Amino acid sequence: MACSWTFLWLLWIALVAVLLFALRGPLKISESLESVTATSYFNNLTPKFYVALTGTSSLVSGIILIFEWWYFKNNAGIDAGDEEGSDNDESIENTKTVPECKVWRNPMALFRAAEYNRFRKETNSEPLTYYDMNLSAQDHQSLFMCDEDQGRAEYEIMQVAWRERESEERIQTARAALAINPECASALVLLAEEESETVSQAENLLRRALRAIESTLNSYSNNQIASYAQNGDAVRKRDLTIQTYIKRRLAMCARKQGRLREAIKGFRDLSRDQSLSTLLSVQDNLIEACLEVQAYADVQNLLVRYDGYGAPCSYELREPRSAAMSYTSALLKVRAVAENFRCAADSSIRRGLSSAEQTAIEALTRAMEFNPHVPPYLLELRSMIMPPEHFLKRGDSEALAYAFFHIQHWKRIDGALQLLSIVWKDFVPKVSKDKNAFSSQLESADKELLPSWHEQSVFPKTEGTLMMLLQTFICLAICILAVLAQQFPASSGEIFRTAATIGMQFYENSVYTVSQWAPGNIIPYLASKQVPVPEL
């Protein structure tokens, strides 16, 4: 931005110099300088001139002061801090200004073979990026592998399988591990994710993997399985994690096939173990399944239990944990008032609202402040793509991960999307004034998680440098035309009349060309009403 403004100032100075040089003859600048000496010029100045000069300089100084105050008010917090401050102060400032760019696993991630690969075959477009798939490979290694696997051939092979870049190579490596141990749960999970062409086939492989891992857990000498949070055997912890992962994917298969009660029961059973459910974000799956069966009271209890967000006036206490929590809480508040909302779309000040309506509007605003990329997808103002396997909180990737699964819940409630649209239209101009509310670091990080053919959501939209330069050139052209019109009124008037004549001729030629292709009565024909013919 600083470079563009410097360029514009230099361009302005250069254009003024060129303009003065071009008008040196008509303005008689050289003759005026030769005829009037500096001494006679200053002797002819009156006290009124000095008063006017003082007033003008004071006015200009005041304008500069106002613009400086406006600039520093809007750009406060960009710089790290004063140079005189201590290192501690600088580190505190940096932690406040730098946003969190941690990548989170999408708990609602689809099956690669049954869903992502079908999309790729139909559209010839890659739904996932290599960076996203590499993060998934790292997740699988941390969940399904441990240091005690050394010397066990099938698990050593699976370590190689998770690192393979191509899907076919991963499948072949997993088959090699199954050839050594037909009950290798990790290999069965990989085949369910990447080879099964339908959700039903993936469910069958996952059930087989669940039987294998439960048999392994029952074979331990100590039948009572230690909790994940306690210090215990690393292999047993790994097997417990695999068991939880498989149960979660089985519940997701039941959800996708319409067995909602079975899915909710599976998610509830998993949520009892706080450590594992938090690690895998099972609460998001449970909330979405409860929304599908319209168990809104259970959803409210889940929001209070897992996040504290959704309790009365909790939005005033702290930030929500995720877009799913914030927008689900807003949806529950909107549900109570959406049908009877009395606010006009173009009114900026809403009068006579009930406390429930004010609470719903505040909850929506709070959710939009956390992630403003969600409303365009819910309102279908932007085209939606398949969600990535990982997302960044407050980014476009999180908005896709939420809207892909929750848009039907908003459509089910009459008036919810209308109220969301009203609040969104009122929210955009207010937040667009604050350019520092959302960092551009999230946008650059989201580019690695989303496919290149996807048009990434940017909020707030900044004015491009090309548009700024175009506006500057238009202003300069108007200034030059005004100066020329003042200095050469006769010639300028003739030029303007010639330009107007050319414009009118172009318009008449265009109308004549169009009339040759279209009939003369096309406008009355389009404006006329079709008269229905009565049946005899």
Curated annotation (Swiss-Prot):
Topology term for the membrane: Multi-pass membrane protein
CDD domains cross-referenced by the UniProt entry: ST7 (cd11557)
Keyword annotations: Coiled coil, Membrane, Transmembrane, Transmembrane helix
Gene3D superfamilies documented for this protein: Tetratricopeptide repeat domain
Transmembrane segments: 3-23, 49-69, 465-485
Subcellular location: Membrane
The keyword Coiled coil appears for this protein: yes
Family statement: Belongs to the ST7 family.
Keyword Membrane (UniProt): yes
Record-level GO cellular component terms: membrane
Coiled-coil stretches: 191-218
Main location: membrane
Pfam families reported for this sequence: ST7
Originating species: Caenorhabditis elegans
InterPro entries assigned: ST7 (IPR007311), TPR-like_helical_dom_sf (IPR011990)
Superkingdom of origin: Eukaryota
Name the record gives this protein: Protein ST7 homolog
